[in-house]
Amino acid sequence: MGSTFNCHRPLFMINIRDFMAQDHLHCDGFFQQTERLAAAQNWAGAAAAFAQFKTLVLQHFDAEETLLFPAFEEKSGMRMGPTQVMRDEHTQMRQLMDAAGAALDEKDGGDYAGCAETLLIMVQQHNLKEENVLYPMCDQHLFDQAIVLLPQLQELLPGKAT
């Protein structure tokens, strides 16, 4: 369904959807690591992995909210459409990440599990909407700007460059 990120391909040959979907996978890896460590009650390790996950997700949100979404809204004229829905979901996920992080800090496995389950479902649904609806719309509307936007996104998402 989605293609894999190839850092040897020139950046201009990678579309927005593929680039941002690969960043979703990059973030997801840290969430999966958190889950494994929390299940083993390795609270320090889980908290560290979750902190990295949260940092990467917040960088991803920032790249979307400060660069990608405004460019899409300007070009498409849609300001209260899919980008507003995504911003609202970002707000909800920030709250869930705060709650999950607090549960890890308290070493409360039950509370963490509840927060993490809700967060996981929300992240999966959110990513599907972005990857199957919003990012293809961005590729369509921002095609002529992709050669400028993709390097800027890469700069904002440093984990993607490696």
Language model regions located:
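Small-residue-biased structural context
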Residues: 2-162
